[in-house]
Amino acid sequence: MIISTSRFGQVELKQEDVLTFTEGLLGFADLRKFVLLDDPNDEIFAWLQSCEAPAIAFPVLEPELFAPQYKATLTKGDMEALKLTAQDKARYFSIVTIPDDPTLMTANLKAPVVVNIEARTARQCVLQDNNLAIREPIFTKLQQRVVQNPAVAIKNQSTGIDVATKLHVVRDAEL
C-alpha cells in the first residue's frame, strides 16, 4: 500500500506495518492508523506517521535513550486495550516537541505511545507516575549521550524487532 505524507511524500508500506490505535492519540481521536517510520537519514528520531492524514507526523524516541532509568507501569485497562499479557511485549516511544530553537526540545515521558509488538496495536497511555514530565528537556541529554558513546547510534533501531518500518519513498517512476 502507498500512503501520502507531507514530510516524505509517497511512502510504500505493507499492511502489517500499520499500527492500529485502540483510541486516537491525545488531541487526534479520529486518527487510528499509524506507521512508525525509520528514516535512515535521521540519526535521532523515528516518525509516527498517520496513514489517514498526510500532514500528521510526530518525531518519537525511545525514552531509554535519554532517560536510562525510565520505567513505565501500565494500568490493567491499558494492558487490556493493547491486548498485552506482559509488559515486556511492549515498546515505548515518547513524542518529541521540537521548537524553532532545537536546544529547547522536549519529550513527553508522562504519556508515551505504547506498542504491542505482536498484535500491532498501540495506545498513548497516560501513566500514573506523577514524577514523569510532560515536557522533559532532552537536548543536553542527547548531546551527552553522543559525547559519551560517539560510536553508538542514538536511535535504537527498532526495525530489528519489527516495530519500525524502514522508510521507502516512492519515486514518480515507481508510481
Swiss-Prot record:
Q: What domain of life does the UniProt record list for this protein's source?
A: Bacteria
One record GO biological process: regulation of translation
Q: Give a Pfam family name.
A: FliW
The record's section on InterPro entries has:
Flagellar_assembly_factor_FliW, Flagellar_assmbl_FliW_dom_sf
* Record flagged with keyword Chaperone: yes
Query: What UniProt keywords are attached to this protein's entry?
Result: Bacterial flagellum biogenesis, Chaperone, Cytoplasm, Translation regulation
Question: Which subcellular locations apply to this protein?
Answer: Cytoplasm
Subunit structure, as described in the record: Interacts with translational regulator CsrA and flagellin(s).
Q: Which HAMAP family match?
A: FliW
Q: Which family does it belong to?
A: Belongs to the FliW family.
- Describe the task this protein carries out: Acts as an anti-CsrA protein, binds CsrA and prevents it from repressing translation of its target genes, one of which is flagellin. Binds to flagellin and participates in the assembly of the flagellum.
Give the protein name, as stated in the record: Flagellar assembly factor FliW
Q: Which gene encodes it?
A: fliW
